[in-house]
Amino acid sequence: MESTPTKQKAIFSASLLLFAERGFDATTMPMIAENAKVGAGTIYRYFKNKESLVNELFQQHVNEFLQCIESGLANERDGYRDGFHHIFEGMVTFTKNHPRALGFIKTHSQGTFLTEESRLAYQKLVEFVCTFFREGQKQGVIRNLPENALIAILFGSFMEVYEMIENDYLSLTDELLTGVEESLWAALSRQS
């Protein structure tokens, strides 16, 4: 018999896949149970309902993503461009570990089903990125565009590249990642 953590992990994995592919409204608890290979009742041992499941999953991935992009900056004193490199590396690491999670975060970030705790976690992520861009603008390094435009350039482009990798239109290589990072930097910086 599977252990409790293994079942819960299977439920999270199945939920992430289905929510990312189908969205919240089109995903049902029986679909999640079938994909996770657990009984439908098993899900309700861990989660009150679909809303509590999606919120826990959302918070988990938002917080982990924030940790990934923050981690390189904590000790970074070599300059703004190096800080950008660490954020990019954090994005790559997170996406390699959770291929569908960024898409899930993006498509569910404005969901009416999100709790206050989920909204605050997402706001903390957005504020971290905005603060990074504001600092770059103060230093004259980052283009004078609205923060949301800068976020769209960074994450939108990155997510599109990773989607092409997932669908085998691109091969994940160090050269590709270096080129993508340099292209994103050129799009965001005044020094391109």
Swiss-Prot record:
- In this record, what's one Pfam family? TetR_C_10
Q: Which Gene3D superfamilies match?
A: Tetracycline Repressor, domain 2
- Name of the protein in question: HTH-type transcriptional repressor Bm3R1
DNA-binding region positions on the chain: 28-47
Q: Which GO terms describe its molecular function?
A: DNA-binding transcription factor activity; transcription cis-regulatory region binding
Q: Which UniProt keywords apply?
A: DNA-binding, Repressor, Transcription, Transcription regulation
Q: Which InterPro entries match?
A: BscR_C (IPR032551), DNA-bd_HTH_TetR-type_CS (IPR023772), Homeodomain-like_sf (IPR009057), HTH-type_TetR-like_transc_reg (IPR050109), HTH_TetR (IPR001647), Tet_transcr_reg_TetR-rel_C_sf (IPR036271)
What transmembrane ranges does the database entry give?
none
Q: What does this protein do?
A: Negatively controls the expression of the cytochrome p450BM-3 gene at the transcriptional level.
Where do the HTH tetR-type domain residues begin and end? 5-65
Which first-to-last residue range defines the signal peptide? none
